Amino acid sequence: MLNRRTFLTTLAIAPFASFPTQAFSQKTSGKIAISTWSFHNYFPNTRYGKPEFELAEWNLEKVMEVAQSKIGISNFELSSAHLASLENDYLIGLKKLAKDKGYNYIHLSDNMKGVNLSRADETKRAEDFKRFVELISVAEKLGIPSMRVNTGTPEKPDWDLAITIEQYKKLAALGKDKGVEIIIENHFGISADPVKVAKIIEAVGANISSCPDFGLFKSEPERTVGLPIMFKHARKVCSAKFHGFDEQGKPKDFDLENCYKVLKSSNYKGWVSLEYEGPKEPTAMLIKMKSLAQQWLA
């Protein structure tokens, strides 16, 4: 069994009040959502790699329209990088769109560039903290009940985790006042170690939980050990990442079906957010994955 050492190596709200978000509007897809990151190659600011389809420039509204009409899912994990603006007028429009179209914004994921809650410089760390405060306000205005906050990466090897924990304590307290739970995903930096994620969550105590990401492990043995640790503290959302399918139509690169078995054995009741990470056009990938997810969650 792997141990901890293995992982070490490895704003005004009133204008929004009249537009309540759609609550559990899904019919056939259960508590299945789509991460807008699945469509990252349609956004110039999040495009990377070598996409194997004809590129076009979409906005968030287009992504949600396609997901609802072609995939049959109206529940969305929004990437902060896909918000066209953080201004009130834009957010009011997104809130109204949810009401008009039956969309449900289930989670907001921080994809801000250059922020680091584990930065050594106290002044710069405080500046980064303010950016997370602003994003929590965005989640509140959109009626989103949870938000991913990345831990960042220590700039020195002997980083005192207590400093990072203190940042999360302050964010969790603020989020509680605004109806937004703080989420840590096994993403990068400190959070790449599920043991450290658990340590932070247990130290903070309230209004904080984990988001297990199926795909963000370096090896199958690490996934075998790390995923149950992440699910122990998961309540709101998990990232059901997948990399596409092989020639036999089976999920590529890792044992995805076993991830769903871990999910079920943990008695997890939150959202399952499908996230396609690959070079193909995502719509067909998500249609197929939705069918498999429904089968595995049954």
Indicate residue ranges for each PLM-predicted region.
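N-terminal pre-domain/capping segments
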Residues: 2-140, 176, 194, 205-209, ...
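Acidic/histidine-rich catalytic cores of soluble enzymes
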Residues: 46, 75-76, 108, 165, ...
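A short helix->loop->beta-strand "cap" motif at the edges of active sites that frequently abuts
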Residues: 103, 180, 266-270
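Conserved glycine-rich "GG(E/T)P / GGGxP" loop and the immediately following alpha-helix
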Residues: 119-120, 125, 157-161, 186-189
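Active-site cleft segment of glycoside hydrolase catalytic domains centered on the general acid/base Glu
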Residues: 154-168
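Short acidic/histidine-rich active-site segments
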Residues: 273-276
